[in-house]
């Protein structure tokens, strides 16, 4: 990358914590190199306490865009000038575009599109399917929206934090009004309802942080009877590549287990196009993810 850097190099950033595990710098910098673009992508360790200063830095330095990850996806909303319709509906942002570097910041959400493209890549269709989704943070809400827009029959949401239930219920109400998908919300503490939902589902999606450090030894599913030969299990965590949930599901005969690498690739590709205005060469980038 040092050979490409010049006085004209444009910067794209990632604002998150922790960031050491992130694949985004590798993906985006390789894409810039493949396309011959004079851009550089850097990750910055930024939590909610530093977020306002970091966003002002995007404006002041003319940074062309930024990806946003935990814990900043919702906290960044009041710091932006505009939101895309999807980001406004979800109430979270993972991509910020600074058009022409002029300081007008627009927030977008690409997690849902990325997740559904990753599932399609594995031959998994959500149309007319019953899906249980655990975790309704920024990524989980984005996935729920995309599942409804793509024609899922039912989306059964379960949340770990009771404090989120009321705010997420507003999204549930909107999705039930805007789409034909039946969307429900329950507390993950209700294990009876959770297990019943999985038993009736074609696809289980874990959009929580369970499975990644420091929770790498935990799994939301521990009952072998919940794993069926016709159940697909998708964990959006990608580090480790096989979470305890995915290992458990594979060992007990799930139809398919899918980690978060594909979602990272495709949400990144969507973000790349929003910021750069060109398609990411995903076929060239995809093999790099297997190196991690």
Curated annotation (Swiss-Prot):
Looking up InterPro entries in the UniProt record yields:
Aminoacid_DH-like_N_sf (IPR046346), NAD(P)-bd_dom_sf (IPR036291), SDH_C (IPR041121), Shikimate_DH (IPR011342), Shikimate_DH-bd_N (IPR013708), Shikimate_DH_fam (IPR022893)
Q: Which residues form the active site?
A: 73
Keyword list (alphabetical) reads: Amino-acid biosynthesis, Aromatic amino acid biosynthesis, NADP, Oxidoreductase
Q: Which residues bind shikimate?
A: 22-24, 69, 94, 111, 238
Which CDD domains does the record associate with it?
Answer: NAD_bind_Shikimate_DH (cd01065)
Entry EC no(s): 1.1.1.25
Q: What pathway is this protein a component of?
A: Metabolic intermediate biosynthesis; chorismate biosynthesis; chorismate from D-erythrose 4-phosphate and phosphoenolpyruvate: step 4/7
Where, in this chain's numbering, is NADP(+) bound? 135-139, 236, 260
Q: What class of enzyme is it?
A: oxidoreductase
Biological process terms from the Gene Ontology for this record are:
amino acid biosynthetic process; aromatic amino acid family biosynthetic process; chorismate biosynthetic process; shikimate metabolic process
| Gene Ontology molecular function | NADP binding; shikimate 3-dehydrogenase (NADP+) activity
Q: What reaction(s) does this enzyme catalyze?
A: shikimate + NADP(+) = 3-dehydroshikimate + NADPH + H(+)
The record's note on quaternary structure and interaction partners says:
Homodimer.
**UniProt xrefs under HAMAP family:** Shikimate_DH_AroE
User: What is stated as this protein's family in its record?
Assistant: Belongs to the shikimate dehydrogenase family.
Q: What does this protein do?
A: Involved in the biosynthesis of the chorismate, which leads to the biosynthesis of aromatic amino acids. Catalyzes the reversible NADPH linked reduction of 3-dehydroshikimate (DHSA) to yield shikimate (SA).
Protein name per the record = Shikimate dehydrogenase (NADP(+))
Gene name, per UniProt, is aroE
